[in-house]
Amino acid sequence: MKISFFSNYFNHHQEALCNAFYQWLNEGFTFIETEPMEEFRSQMGWGRPAPGYVLKSYLSPENEKKAEELAMESDVVIFGTAPEHFIEKRLEANKLIFRYSERPLKEGRIKVLIPRLAKKFYHNHFRNRNKNIHILAASAYCASDYKFLHSYIGKCYKFGYFPEKEGKSFEELAELKNENKPLKILWAGRFLKLKRADLFLSAAAECRKKGYDFTIEMVGSGEEEGHLKSLTEKLSLSDITEYKGFLSPEETRERMERADIFVMTSNFLEGWGSVIYEALSSGCAVIASHAAGATPFLVEDGVTGRIFKSGSRESLISALEALLKEPEKIRELGKKAYDNMQEYWNPDTAAGRIIEMSEYMLENKEKIYEKGPLSKCEYLYNNWFN
C-alpha cells in the first residue's frame, strides 16, 4: 500500500504518527511538506529534522511535480492543511482521501455568513460531500460542525494528534510522582487569553482557602504572562507557585511525568489540545475543559480524568476539590488514563488502523472499531456538558 500525507509542515504533533506509518509501510509512505515553518513555531520547538520520507514540495518544481504525482497515484491520501489544488484531480477520479481536520466552525457558525469563508466551505466541502472522502477528526466537535455544513455526514472518524507514546511504565511514573510533597498541580501551554490560565489560578486559590495543600507549576510564556504573575501574587499563591518559563515539548513532557494533577482550561477556540493527550499518557489525573476538542475523545469523566464546564470557576473548583480531598483517586485516574492511551490512543494504533480501514474501503467493505482512533464520531455540540 502507498499512503501520502500532505500538510503544511512536518512538526512534533505529526512526527510520531509519521514514524509509525513508515514502520508499517517503509517506502510506501511519504509526508509532503507544502511550506516552510514560520520562525516563531521553530523557536517553540515545533521544528523537526526531516526524515527521508519527507518531500518538501516547495523547494523545487521537480518536488512540486513529484507531490502532484503522489497525490494521484497513492492508494490513500491523508490531507491536512495544504493547498487544495493537490487533490483536485484525485477528487475528480473519486479516489480515497482522508481529510485531517479540526472543527471548521470553532469561532462560531456565524462564519458561514462571511462570503469568503462561505465560498471556501462550498468549494472544499459541500461540493465534495458525496465523494470518496472521509474525515479524520482532530476535534470531537468536527462531526456536528460538518453536519451543519451538510458535508461528510456519517463519514467522520475519531482521530487527533499523536505525540510520542509514553516509554515509562506506570509504576516508574508513579515513583516520580510520589516524590511530590505536597501534591503538584501542573498547568502548561502558551499564556494566551483563550487558554484561561487565570481561571485555574482563581480556582486553585479557592481550594487553598479551604485548607488543601499543594504546589503549582506553570509552564509556558506569552502575552498574558505579566497579568498571570500579578494575579498569582494578588491571590496569595506566590509562595506555592513556580513559573518555569518556556520549555520545549520534550521538557514539558518531563514535567508532566512528575506532576500529580494536570489542569487544562482552554475555551472553544482550542482546536484539539495536545497537552491533554500528553498528560494522560504521562499518568496524570487530568482535569480538562469540556470545550477542548480532545476532551470528549480522551477523558471519560470520573474514569480516566475529570471534566469541568468551560469558563465555570465553580465547576473547576468542584473538579479540583474532588481530587484534593481524595488523593487516592489521583493515581487511580492516572492509571486508567495511562492504560487507555497505551492500548488505544497512540501513534502505532492510529497508523495501523488507518492502514487496515483503508484496505477495507479500497475493497468497498466496512471496518468498525468500537472505541479509540477510527471509531465513528458522535454528533457533539458545545452544550453537551453541564
What do these predicted ranges mean?
Residues 115-135, 144, 148-149:
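Membrane-proximal helix-turn-helix segments that form the acceptor-binding/catalytic region
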Residues 141-142, 158-171, 223:
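Short beta-strand->alpha-helix junction loop in the catalytic core
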Residues 175-195, 201-204, 217:
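Conserved donor-binding/catalytic core segment of Leloir-type glycosyltransferases
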Residues 229-247:
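Nucleotide-activated donor-binding/catalytic signature segment of Leloir-type glycosyltransferases, i.e.
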Residues 246-247, 254-259:
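Short alpha-helical donor nucleotide-sugar binding micro-motif in glycosyltransferases
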Residues 257-271, 284:
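Acidic donor-binding loop of glycosyltransferase active sites
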Residues 285-289, 299:
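Short hydrophobic beta-strand element within catalytic cores of glycosyltransferases
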Residues 300-302, 306-313, 322-327:
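Conserved acidic donor-binding segment of nucleotide-sugar-dependent glycosyltransferases
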